[in-house]
């Protein structure tokens, strides 16, 4: 049931006017015949206490006080209600609750009950309370009329506001779509925020000062990174330009080289050459080349055959062959005599296959400081490179014993004795000259 219908169409109040109330054992007022004494309206109860009141009377008093407070400043209250939608909603709910409570109270049917006899004071108190209820009902009816008028004014104002809102909605129809999108975004943000709030919180971790990154440091780092990127772009552009320049220079060089080659070919004059003479000269050079290759090949084959023949000879035949046909030594030099502590120079082994006078010189002749007689020097100075970092320790090893008796080779043991007798060279009693081929032992 709506609030207007509840206020206008009130049900008839069922009452027992003119009946004599009486109290039962529970202290309630009942109407009708009973065993107890009856009390007529207008008689005061002897046990009435003016300062006492029931819960229902307290509620009525609070409601009347609230209504009077509302009547004090109706204009200000109506202005606040019109401006604030929350107050309007609160007032409407309050009016609805009051109407429902009043209807429930008026619909209460009081049935007659059989009560026991009570004292005259109780009957008089009940009569006074009934009279108080009648007067409060009249005041409530007056307050209800005022509330209805106030409620109708509020409804008219609300209808006017609804019309204004409908006009604004029609004017802002296009903007509503964007508003819905923003609202969806805000709802999504609220949803994400709520999700973030539901996430587990992490334990705070201490970060050292040198490892912290503040906003200024982050901005400085971003600026530095941007400068580095710009510098890298600049260097890449310079490299590209330098590469293009090098390619252009190389292309120019190749073009100039081709031009020079063509110019040299054009400048070559071959009109005066005789092709027959050139061909005859080439034939002579080719024949000499062929002859030289054949002679080298024959000499190599002859040398291999001689080596094979010498290998097949016995020891006596080989000695006789060497005595009869001595070995021919090319560029044989005269063997000279070296002086005391004279430096030795080797003439080398290359290019000795053909006789040359320069290779036949005496290379044992003294040079530079070797002309001096070093035998007259003191014993301590008779060493090579005396006074230098490369000086030798001994003059020569003829008079020096360099045997190391502490080494493993100098120890007398069964293993060393067996090695010296069977494998060591120069320590056995019998000496056999090794041959070119290994002899087969049967």
Swiss-Prot record:
- Protein encoded by which gene: MFAP1
Give the organism, scientific name: Gallus gallus (Chicken)
From the UniProt entry, list the residue stretches annotated as the region Disordered: 1-34, 113-203
Top-level taxon of origin: Eukaryota
Location (main, coarse): nucleus
Q: Which Pfam families does this UniProt record tie to the protein?
A: MFAP1
Where in or outside the cell?
Nucleus
Q: Which UniProt keywords apply?
A: mRNA processing, mRNA splicing, Nucleus, Spliceosome
- Kindly give the PANTHER family that the UniProt entry links to this protein: MICROFIBRIL-ASSOCIATED PROTEIN
Self-association state and partner proteins as the record states:
Component of the spliceosome B complex. Interacts with PRPF38A (via N-terminal interaction domain).
Q: Which residues form the signal peptide?
A: none
Task: Family membership, please give it.
Answer: Belongs to the MFAP1 family.
Q: Please describe what this protein does.
A: Involved in pre-mRNA splicing as a component of the spliceosome.
Output the lineage of the source organism: Eukaryota, Metazoa, Chordata, Craniata, Vertebrata
Which InterPro entries does the entry mention? MFAP1, MFAP1_C
Query: One GO term of the cellular component aspect?
Result: U2-type precatalytic spliceosome
Q: In which tissues is it expressed?
A: Widely expressed.
Q: What is this protein called?
A: Microfibrillar-associated protein 1
The Gene Ontology biological process annotation of the record reads: mRNA splicing, via spliceosome
Q: Where is the composition biased (Acidic residues)?
A: 134-148, 181-198
